[in-house]
Each structure stands twice: as structure tokens, then as C-alpha cells.
């Protein structure tokens, strides 16, 4: 079985000696191989039943032969992980003015809180062999309002600009309230993994974060979480939205006048609410199925921030075009804890 270790302190190389609790997982990746050349068999050549059975057995076992096991380690962020953490943060914050290096240093400073997921290594491998496969932690947003780090100010500028363009007024005002509160009871939840990384790691990682938070002296009351998702592009959606928001009666040529900003936002939100959605992190869907606590959110497009050809740009699947979006969620502590608990209990995805 592959293993995930949660190290509570010290260097990564000392995990075994520290005898910390083990978090158990298994990751299986399929390795595609070039097909073996098939020899032509003459039509008059006899092939025994036993030979046929051997061939069938080989085909049935092909998948097992191509399965590779990888061990992963999960441990608190350290200086060695700075570049990997930046890469993880870049998945959410595309082409922003946020100082992600400074944010990564802030995350490292909060260790042992948080989890960085990387492939296990042996003694012959070097630090250069490392890359981060996942990151899960919380970043306090307002525990030092009068002298907040620049990356925190940049973060609020970013989310406020996005909210101003596409969010209801209540969400914009809520973000402003969080920014000025200065009580240290609000945080950003970071939950990043490489695209299509197995969700089998979720229970162990969420359980670790939930355990960490239970020991915090100051409890978070409000959490901001920026999710990655894709939304199907619907032909003629703009026309439908315009007609619906204008209360069209179907009378040709009748004009209702220009839509105001608030109407446009409501119309856009209604269109997105009815569209097909896929979350990059499948567990994120559970957040909106939970009944405990409260949450508000809005979606905003990011395809203009992604290089064409990137795996994070628009994709085609089953004849549909899926455009990249971000969903900014603001939730209370009850919803957040229920989300972590659901994940740590082993949600079915």
C-alpha cells in the first residue's frame, strides 16, 4: 500500500525516526504503453485451445501489469516547498498582481499547520527531485489589519475587483467587512492539487486540517474559499438571459430598454446557476449539499487569464465547450467544519 505520512515537525528526511502518525492512502496511475507488434498467423495454422486461453489471460491481466504504485508523503510546509507552494497557488490565482511568493512564505510561517503533498523519495534522491502534488491550509486574512502583509492587501484588491464586476452587492459588502474587521477570525481556505489527482487523499488531508483548527486559540468564524470549476458554454445563452431578465412577453420588436448593472449581474448569475458545472476538485460539490451553516458565492470567468492550450483553458468534451471559472465562496464556521468533516469521514466521489 502507498502511504501518506503527516509529520508534525522537523525535516522531511526524519519522518521515519520521528515515528509520527501515518495517514494511509493509495494512488494508482495507469501507464500507457505502446502496443506490442502482433505477428501474422497463417490461416491454415492450428492454434490450440490452451494457446487461446493464454492469450485471453494476458489480455485480462494487461491492466494489472500497467498499474504503478506511488508512495506520497504529507507534511507541514517547509522552506524546501516554497516553489511548489507557489505553483499550487498559481492554479487558482492566474495572472494576478498577488505576491504568491510572499503568500507561500506566510503559509510556511504557520507550520506545522497545513499539509503539502509530495511523492515519497529514497535516500538517493535530492530536493530537486521534489514537486508539490497538493497543498491544503488556511491563511488568516485580518489578524493584523493595521500592518497587513502586502499579499493580503493584494488578495483583497483582487477579490473585490472580481466581486465588483460580477457579484451581488451583499457579497461585495461582506468582503469589505472581512477586510476591515481586524479580529483575526477570517481566513482563506487553500485546497489545491494537481489536476485529476486522485481524490483518495482527501479524507486524510481534510482530517489533518480539521484537527489543526481544533487546536487554534482564535477560532475562524468566516472562511473564503476560491474553487476551480468549468461551466458549459451554451449557444444563445446571452439572448436567453436578456429576454428572461427583461421580462419579454414574446412580442416581436418590443424593447424594454437597457438593463442596469444589477439586472445584468442577476441575469448572469441565473444563467450560470442553470448551466452544467464540473469542479476541478470533485469534493467541492459537497460544500453545496451540506445543510449545516450558511454560504454565499458567485462565479467569475478566467479564460482570459489562461494561455491558449493550457490544461486550465477551455476544453472540449462530448461536443460541449467547458470554460474555466472560479467560484468565490464565503461561508461561516459551521459550514466549513461540516465540509471538512464530510471530507475526513470519506465522502463518496
UniProtKB/Swiss-Prot annotation:
UniProt-annotated stretches for the region Disordered = 1-65
Q: Where do Acidic residues bias regions lie?
A: 34-65
Q: Which GO terms describe its cellular component?
A: nucleus
The residue ranges flagged as biased composition, category Basic residues, are: 1-10
Under the heading InterPro entries, the entry gives: BCP1_family (IPR025602)
- Residue spans of biased composition, Basic and acidic residues class: 11-33
Q: Which PANTHER family match?
A: BRCA2 AND CDKN1A INTERACTING PROTEIN, BRCA2 AND CDKN1A-INTERACTING PROTEIN
What the record says about family reads:
Belongs to the BCP1 family.
Instruction: Tell me the protein's name.
Output: Protein BCCIP homolog
Q: Upper taxonomic classification of the species? A: Eukaryota, Metazoa, Ecdysozoa, Nematoda, Chromadorea
Amino acid at each position: 500500500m502507498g502511504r501518506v505520512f503527516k509529520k508534525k515537525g522537523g525535516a522531511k528526511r526524519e519522518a521515519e525516526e520521528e515515528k509520527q502518525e501515518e495517514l494511509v492512502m493509495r494512488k494508482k496511475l495507469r501507464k500507457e504503453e505502446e502496443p506490442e507488434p502482433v505477428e501474422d498467423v497463417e490461416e491454415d495454422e492450428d492454434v490450440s485451445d490452451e494457446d487461446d486461453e493464454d492469450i485471453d489471460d494476458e489480455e485480462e491481466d494487461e491492466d494489472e501489469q500497467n498499474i504503478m504504485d506511488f508512495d506520497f508523503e504529507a507534511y507541514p510546509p517547509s522552506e524546501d516547498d516554497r516553489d511548489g507552494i507557489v505553483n499550487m497557488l498559481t492554479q487558482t490565482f492566474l495572472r494576478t498582481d498577488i505576491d504568491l511568493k510572499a503568500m507561500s512564505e506566510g503559509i510556511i510561517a504557520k507550520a506545522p499547520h497545513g499539509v503539502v503533498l509530495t511523492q515519497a523519495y529514497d535516500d538517493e534522491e535530492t530536493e530537486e527531485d521534489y514537486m508539490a502534488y497538493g497543498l491544503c491550509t488556511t491563511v488568516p486574512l485580518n489578524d493584523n489589519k493595521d500592518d497587513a502583509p502586502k499579499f493580503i492587501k493584494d488578495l483583497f484588491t483582487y477579490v473585490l475587483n472580481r466581486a465588483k464586476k460580477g457579484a451581488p452587492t451583499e457579497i461585495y459588502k461582506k468582503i469589505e467587512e472581512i477586510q476591515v474587521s481586524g479580529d483575526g477570525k477570517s481566513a482563506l481556505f487553500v485546497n489545491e492539487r494537481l489536476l485529476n489527482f486522485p481524490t483518495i487523499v482527501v479524507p486524510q488531508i481534510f482530517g489533518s486540517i480539521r484537527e489543526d483548527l481544533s487546536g487554534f486559540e482564535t477560532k475562524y468564524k468566516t472562511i473564503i474559499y476560491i474553487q476551480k470549476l468549468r461551466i458549459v458554454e451554451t449557444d444563445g445563452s446571452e439572448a436567453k438571459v436578456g429576454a428572461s431578465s427583461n421580462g419579454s412577453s414574446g412580442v416581436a420588436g418590443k424593447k424594454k430598454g437597457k438593463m442596469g448593472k444589477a439586472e445584468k449581474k442577476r441575469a448572469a448569475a441565473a444563467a450560470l446557476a442553470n448551466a452544467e458545472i464540473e469542479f476541478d476538485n470533485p469534493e467541492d460539490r459537497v460544500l453545496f449539499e451540506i445543510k449545516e451553516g450558511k454560504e454565499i458565492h458567485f462565479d467569475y470567468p478566467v479564460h482570459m487569464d489562461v494561455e491558449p492550450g493550457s490544461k486550465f483553458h477551455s476544453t472540449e468534451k462530448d461536443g460541449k465547450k467547458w470554460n474555466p471559472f472560479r467560484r468565490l465562496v464565503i461561508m461561516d464556521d459551521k459550514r466549513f467544519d461540516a465540509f471538512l468533516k464530510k471530507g475526513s469521514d470519506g465522502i463518496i466521489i
